[in-house]
């Protein structure tokens, strides 16, 4: 019994302690609130928070404080400035350019995710979204256009008073805490069902509407569309359905909601408002309309707004960061219709442009690669490399190099090397040799050589190495041919008679062709005579045959007319051909003049080739090729029968004669010191004349004239001539087998050197010299050669230059390459006239009397011919064409003259000078021999040229249009040429007394060809010429030039009634021509027809009666020229033949006619505002404007518009195309055994319900169901 009181007392003593501990546990208290944190946003409503500590006595680490430890409040609730980026979009943009599964995207906000406060973003152009963060930054709106915001990952309510968790809300009129009395509702249901397929207008929401809500009554295949009253679609326009999204429209945010593809759900549109412009709501109808409910609110007691400004939504920002701009349309409206802007001019006009996205751009790192180098080999497997480096981009286009370590974290550094040209190399394949070309003697045999690829198929010869190409031909030796008696002796032509009268002697060559003379004696007893008497008539009678004293003849033998004149010097200098001279007693006053220099007004005379008479008619055969049996293998002896009968055997030549060969390599000398050989031209101190026969002399060098320097290339006489290097022989007429093709922009055939061919039928032809852009003459042997061969200069220029070929640097232009020491060589190595190669013209010299032109003065007897000045070297040294037969030391010094001539300024240490006047155009050529690919680096005063008035031409020259004084300075070019200094040209812009003739438009007004001045452009000035300008000094008389009209101007001009038109007419010549315009032979003169100072005719207010032909007539007192211009007055455009509506059965062809009255009209078709592209299969558009659509389908229905355009005129007409569906069959057709449903793979009922039979993937599982039910095709979808 005593135990219970003890226990009771212990309980009483322990209870107060336990109670005290419980009291202390519950007395955990909050400390004071801390400071408010910075606001999470700078505008638009951010969140700031503060925290307080809990003081607790608990030992387990927990607390017993009741209430939140953090308090939030809104801050910076004022609206953000215009153009600031969406806050959620800024957070998504932080991941732009970062690696995401091996790719880099631009991220946009995605609002349709279930959790509104997660940072879900969607890549631009993709159809998936990704959660980048679990929570957005505090203060981010939960949905666009709404006031609720996210705080700590939870969507919190914000009242209209901008306070967190406030219950104060806006009414439908957007009044905070209002009762809705300041506006009135507009509600209704659009349930019309007689709608056409396509877009149908439902209603118009006026400007100023608030609390807009539009929703389908039930799910359907129809779509809601929104556009402005100007016809600009904001949503689902042009048959393109967009995904659910928030759209900035009419200064509010329009929230568009619909199900994804295959998920039928009613469509819904919501917007807070107020709208800044009327919005047109349409229904894109595809099936019956279940009804569309709509509700919006308008301000109450609106007295009628009258005319007022409306504006559209702001467009996209021009830059994603770093500061851009955006614009919007501002227009005047009343009663939901647009009116001209001046109707609203009494009200302030809203701004239409603002800045946007001013935040700095983030820097991103990425790898950048350079171009691949050429492959190390052309076949068989090689390697090529490229540079790969790390760069940093700032988002505005700026880039800078970065350390590779900064890109080390990026996935997949691009490779720096790769294999290339892995295909097997092509090889030469040879066929067996063919038969020999002869049955006896020596001939040739051929075989076929083909380049074949790795599979044995033939490929182009360029794929094989040309140096390894097997030979195509080789000699073959058959049995010796029988020798006939008449073929043993080779008899040459008679030489000139030793006397012209009184019995002279002449000789000829008689050679045994089969070996020693004894063999010929065995076959033929009598040897033909080698010498006979000649000219035995008395001296008062004419000579019977040509003699040394008078080589003229009436003989038709072409070999009697001229002969080679060879200098017997031992250094192998070239032969020179010239006309035979008359005896001094019969010489004309021009005797002694250089035969290669032309008289004024004539082109330079060609020098004759070897073995060739002057180019004049002759009745006799020209060479052995005209003999009945052709030529012998030596190329000059006529064959006496087939199989080279009577031809000399190999080795039986003049080399076996007693005194050896003459310098021509064919004729045998008749005595020592080349006695009996024909001399080269040029006179000597013994009185022998050119063309005379030589006699033995103790001083053989007496008759040696100066020959031209330079060795003739052996390739020139090959079958196809020389390659571009003038050393190697070409393998074909287009330079096959040649390397190092020049980089001139001319056809390939025009880049080759001249080729004389392998025959001797000499004729003058023309070839193109690409280095100067002109044509030159050369001797052609009559067969083979290459394709750079033309019958006339006009054909040559038209083929190689055409009307718009690369511009030829004019003579005198800086940088023109002067070929001074030698021109193109003719047959036998003779020089062709240098002035043709350089593109210059030998000018006429002015007479002392001051007349503009006269023929050149005759040189005094014994004096060398006078040579006009050809050009100046820097420092005054003059450059002239070489005079054949005249030694360099014997050249006379030509005194300076004021004659108008072309001069060539060679590149030197001083800059070339170009002068021009303001307003003109000037073309600068790079001085020196610089290829065009190195001329592109033009600079002025050491800085790159960037003005749009500077245009770089294809030939590397620079054109400066509309010259200004500030364009003067030092221009340099060729700076990209490795190892060379840039060339400089000084441009001086002056308005002094120098008359400048610009060549600013060379392609539109080509240089003339004056037949009186050779083949160069007309002389228009004197003095130094450079840079494409020709400067005429007023201190010297200007020469007369031929009148010509610019015929490159349009010959047909179209105009519309009421227009002002100009008919151009440009003329050049001196004296300056006057221009007049005529029509029907009468002068054109009226207040509407005015002739301008530049010669053009201006017609004001063109009328239909002004159409017709006009002639421009130019006259300068000496010449007269005219050209015709047709003026066509175009009538108004009209369209006929297109009915308002067309109904075509399904599967048939729709033929839509569009007949347009008018000329030069372009016709375009469109469907529902989108252009129609003809595919050549189902859709065709003929030139007359007819549109054909085969196999018409229901989806082809719509509004088709034919638009006709001509200049600024346009007209259009539309028609509605309806498709008549066939009547349903009474019984279902047999679908066949293969067309069945596959229920184990797809739910066909759902596919039919979702109307996905038009999808190839889904319909493949439900063939039978989709065949029985073919829904109409749906519009194009765009997801994301």
Curated annotation (Swiss-Prot):
Coiled coil: none
Gene Ontology BP annotations: extracellular matrix organization
Keywords linked to the UniProt accession: Disulfide bond, Immunoglobulin domain, Protease inhibitor, Repeat, Secreted, Serine protease inhibitor, Signal
Chief site of localization: secreted
Comp. bias regions, Polar residues: 585-599
Cellular compartment(s): Secreted
Alphabetical list of Gene3D superfamilies matching this protein: 2.60.120.830, Immunoglobulins, Pancreatic trypsin inhibitor Kunitz domain, Thrombospondin type-1 (TSP1) repeat
Superkingdom of the organism of origin: Eukaryota
SUPFAM superfamilies named among the record's database cross-references: BPTI-like, Immunoglobulin, TSP-1 type 1 repeat
Domain Ig-like C2-type: 900-990, 1039-1128, 1133-1218
Basic and acidic residues biased stretches: 706-715, 879-891, 1002-1012
The protein's name: Papilin
Species of the source: Mus musculus (Mouse)
């Amino acid at each position: 019994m005593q135990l219970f009181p003890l226990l009771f007392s212990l309980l009483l003593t322990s209870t107060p302690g336990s109670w005290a501990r419980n009291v202390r546990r519950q007395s955990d208290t909050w400390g004071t609130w801390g400071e408010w944190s910075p606001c999470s946003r700078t505008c638009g409503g951010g969140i700031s928070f503060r925290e307080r500590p809990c003081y607790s006595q608990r030992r387990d680490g927990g607390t017993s404080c009741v209430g939140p430890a953090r308090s939030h409040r809104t801050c910076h609730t004022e609206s953000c400035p215009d153009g600031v980026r969406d806050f959620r979009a800024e957070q998504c943009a932080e991941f732009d350019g970062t690696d995401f599964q091996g790719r880099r995207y631009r991220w946009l906000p995605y609002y349709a995710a279930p959790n509104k406060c997660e940072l879900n973003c969607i890549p631009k152009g993709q159809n998936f979204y990704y959660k980048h963060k679990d929570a957005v930054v505090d203060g981010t709106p939960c949905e666009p256009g709404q006031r609720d915001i996210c705080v700590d990952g939870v969507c919190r309510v914000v009242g209209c008073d901008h306070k967190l968790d406030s219950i104060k809300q806006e009414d439908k009129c957007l009044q905070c805490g209002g009762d809705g009395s300041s506006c009135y509702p507009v509600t209704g249901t659009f349930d019309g069902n007689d709608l056409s397929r396509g877009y149908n207008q439902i209603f118009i929401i006026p400007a100023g509407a608030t609390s807009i809500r539009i929703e389908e009554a039930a799910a359907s295949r129809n779509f809601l569309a929104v556009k402005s009253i100007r016809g600009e679609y904001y949503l689902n326009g042009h048959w393109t359905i967009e995904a659910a999204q928030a759209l900035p429209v009419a200064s509010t945010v329009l929230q568009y909601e619909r199900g994804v593809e295959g998920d039928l759900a009613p469509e819904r549109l919501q917007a807070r408002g107020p709208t800044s412009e009327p919005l047109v709501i349409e229904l894109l109808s595809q099936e019956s309309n279940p009804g569309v409910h709509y509700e919006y609110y308008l301000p109450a007691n609106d007295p009628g707004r009258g005319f007022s400004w409306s504006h559209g939504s702001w467009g996209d920002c021009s830059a994603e960061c770093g500061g851009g701009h955006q614009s919007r349309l501002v227009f005047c409206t009343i009663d939901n219709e647009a009116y001209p802007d001046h109707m609203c001019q009494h009200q302030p006009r809203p701004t239409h442009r603002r800045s946007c996205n001013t935040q700095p751009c983030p820097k991103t790192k990425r790898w950048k690669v350079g171009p691949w180098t050429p492959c190390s080999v052309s076949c068989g497997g090689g390697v090529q490399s490229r540079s790969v480096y790390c760069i940093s981009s700032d988002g505005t286009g700026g880039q800078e190099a970065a350390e590779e370590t900064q890109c080390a974290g990026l996935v997949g550094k691009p490779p720096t090397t790769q294999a290339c040209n892995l295909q097997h190399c092509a090889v030469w394949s040879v066929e067996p040799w063919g038969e020999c070309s002869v049955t006896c003697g020596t001939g040739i045999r051929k075989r076929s050589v083909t380049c074949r690829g790795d599979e044995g198929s033939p490929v182009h010869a360029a794929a094989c190495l040309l140096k390894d190409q097997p030979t195509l031909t080789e000699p073959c030796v058959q049995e010796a041919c029988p020798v006939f008696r008449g073929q043993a002796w080779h008899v040459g032509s008679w030489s000139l008679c030793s006397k012209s009268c009184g019995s002279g002697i002449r000789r000829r060559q008689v050679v045994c062709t089969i070996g020693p003379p004894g063999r010929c004696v065995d076959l033929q007893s009598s040897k033909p005579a080698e010498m006979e008497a000649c000219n035995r008539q008395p001296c008062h009678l004419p000579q019977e045959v040509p003699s040394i004293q008078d080589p003229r003849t009436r003989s038709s033998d072409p070999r009697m007319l001229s002969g080679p004149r060879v200098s017997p010097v031992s250094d192998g200098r070239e032969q020179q051909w010239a006309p035979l001279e008359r005896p001094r007693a019969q010489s004309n006053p021009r005797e002694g003049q250089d035969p290669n220099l032309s008289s004024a007004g004539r082109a330079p005379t060609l020098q004759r080739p070897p073995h060739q008479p002057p180019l004049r008619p002759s009745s006799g055969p020209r060479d052995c090729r005209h003999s009945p049996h052709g030529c012998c293998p030596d190329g000059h002896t006529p064959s006496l029968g087939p199989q080279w009968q009577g031809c000399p055997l190999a080795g039986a030549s003049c080399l076996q004669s007693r005194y050896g060969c003459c310098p021509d390599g064919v004729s045998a000398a008749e005595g020592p010191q080349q006695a009996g050989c024909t001399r080269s031209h040029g006179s000597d101190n013994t009185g022998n004349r050119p063309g005379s026969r030589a006699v033995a002399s103790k001083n053989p060098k007496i008759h040696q004239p100066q020959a031209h320097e330079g060795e003739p290339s052996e390739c020139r006489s090959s079958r196809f001539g020389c390659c571009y290097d003038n050393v190697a022989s070409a393998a074909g007429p287009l330079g096959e087998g040649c390397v190092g093709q020049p980089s001139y922009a001319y056809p390939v055939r025009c880049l080759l050197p001249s080729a004389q061919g392998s025959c001797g039928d000499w004729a003058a032809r023309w070839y193109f010299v690409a280095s100067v852009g002109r044509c030159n003459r050369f001797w052609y042997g009559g067969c083979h050669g290459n394709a750079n061969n033309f019958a006339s200069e006009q054909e040559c220029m038209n083929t190689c230059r055409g009307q718009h070929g690369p511009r030829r640097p004019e003579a005198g232009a800086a940088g023109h390459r002067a070929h001074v020491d030698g021109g193109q060589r003719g047959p036998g190595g003779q020089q062709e006239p240098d002035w043709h190669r350089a593109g210059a013209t030998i000018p006429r010299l002015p007479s002392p009397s001051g007349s503009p032109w006269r023929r050149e003065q005759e040189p005094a007897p014994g004096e060398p011919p006078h040579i006009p000045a050809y050009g100046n070297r820097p420092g005054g040294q003059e450059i002239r064409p070489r005079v054949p037969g005249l030694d360099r030391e014997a050249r006379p010094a030509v005194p300076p003259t004021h004659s108008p001539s072309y001069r060539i300024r060679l590149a030197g240490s001083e800059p070339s000078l170009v002068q021009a006047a303001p307003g003109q155009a000037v073309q600068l050529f790079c001085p020196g021999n610089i290829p065009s690919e190195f001329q592109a680096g033009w600079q002025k005063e050491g800085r790159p040229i960037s003005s749009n008035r500077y245009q770089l031409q294809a030939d590397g020259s620079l054109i400066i249009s509309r010259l200004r004084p500030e364009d003067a300075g030092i221009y340099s070019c060729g700076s990209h040429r490795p190892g060379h200094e840039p060339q400089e040209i000084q441009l001086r812009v002056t308005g002094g007394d120098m008359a400048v003739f610009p060549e600013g438009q060379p392609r539109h007004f080509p240089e003339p060809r004056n037949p009186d001045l050779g083949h160069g452009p007309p002389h228009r000035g004197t003095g130094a010429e450079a840079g494409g300008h020709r400067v005429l000094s007023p201190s010297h008389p200007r020469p007369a030039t031929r009148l010509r009209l610019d015929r490159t101007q349009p010959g047909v001009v179209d105009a519309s009634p009421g227009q002002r038109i100009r008919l151009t007419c440009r003329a050049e010549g001196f004296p300056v021509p006057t221009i007049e315009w005529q029509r029907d032979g009468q002068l054109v003169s009226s207040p509407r027809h005015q002739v301008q100072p530049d010669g053009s005719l201006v017609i004001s207010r063109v009328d239909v009666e002004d159409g017709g032909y006009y002639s421009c007539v130019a006259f300068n007192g000496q010449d007269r020229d005219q050209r015709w211009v047709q003026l066509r007055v175009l009538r108004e455009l009209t369209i006929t033949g297109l009915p308002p509506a067309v109904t075509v059965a399904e599967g048939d062809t729709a033929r839509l006619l569009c007949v347009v009255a008018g000329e030069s009209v372009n016709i375009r078709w469109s469907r529902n505002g989108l252009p129609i592209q003809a595919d050549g299969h189902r859709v065709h558009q003929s030139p007359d404007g007819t549109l054909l659509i085969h196999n018409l389908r229901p989806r082809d229905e719509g509004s088709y518009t034919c638009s006709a355009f001509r200049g600024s005129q346009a007209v259009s007409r539309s028609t509605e195309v309806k498709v008549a569906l066939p009547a349903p069959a009474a019984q279902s057709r047999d679908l066949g055994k293969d067309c069945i449903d596959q229920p184990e793979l797809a739910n066909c009922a759902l596919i039919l319900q979702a109307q996905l039979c038009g999808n190839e993937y889904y319909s493949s599982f439900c063939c039978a169901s989709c065949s029985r039910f073919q829904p109409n095709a749906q519009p194009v979808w765009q997801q994301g």
